[in-house]
């Protein structure tokens, strides 16, 4: 019987070593050589200190900053671990809200967000990405339209001209990949860092 099972056991061990150890290590080493910044998480440093990643959004809430998309990520409730509490941009629990388009809680949240944004900029249409969460809850980018929508608020809070901020948004806008894939986008962290550097 061992004679019949032996090839299966040898194959299992060989494939486990190959796909579970050799392949991941080889790909990690290759990525480190070809894409060193991305392989380390696309970390953004300022004054030698890591302040974030270009791949994970952050919860900017002050008027002087551009805000990202809403985040539906959660964390364990400190009082009752069987429940969760909102924890925007919690990378340890990447997820969307899983609320359907007819869910009252989702509808109410979106309406509240639209009302707040309309109060901020009554003359412009609210871009959809400022009131909807991404599937991961960690999206670091917004559309150029969403950034431009926020220009009056940020200009007022910073005492900068709207024209200067529009140029900053334009400078940080990225086109579709290869002209086809994805949508035009602005990385919120990079834009806010440039905003802090602007005088």
Swiss-Prot record:
- Entry-linked InterPro entries: KdpC (IPR003820)
What residue spans carry the region label Disordered? 67-86
Listed Polar residues bias regions: 71-84
Question: Where would you find the membrane-spanning parts of this chain?
Answer: 7-27
Return the protein name: Potassium-transporting ATPase KdpC subunit
Q: Where in the cell is it found?
A: Cell inner membrane
Task: Enumerate the NCBIfam families for this protein.
Answer: kdpC, PRK00315.1, PRK13999.1
The entry assigns this protein to a family as follows:
Belongs to the KdpC family.
Show the GO cellular component annotation of the record. plasma membrane
Report which superkingdom the organism of origin falls in.
Bacteria
Keyword terms of this UniProt record: ATP-binding, Cell inner membrane, Cell membrane, Ion transport, Membrane, Nucleotide-binding, Potassium, Potassium transport, Transmembrane, Transmembrane helix, Transport
The subunit structure is: The system is composed of three essential subunits: KdpA, KdpB and KdpC.
The UniProt entry lists the main location of this chain as membrane
| Any one GO molecular-function label of the UniProt entry | P-type potassium transmembrane transporter activity
Q: What does this protein do?
A: Part of the high-affinity ATP-driven potassium transport (or Kdp) system, which catalyzes the hydrolysis of ATP coupled with the electrogenic transport of potassium into the cytoplasm. This subunit acts as a catalytic chaperone that increases the ATP-binding affinity of the ATP-hydrolyzing subunit KdpB by the formation of a transient KdpB/KdpC/ATP ternary complex.
- Membrane-topology annotation of the record: Single-pass membrane protein
Starting at the broadest rank, the lineage of the source organism is: Bacteria, Pseudomonadati, Pseudomonadota, Alphaproteobacteria, Hyphomicrobiales
What Pfam families does this protein map onto? KdpC
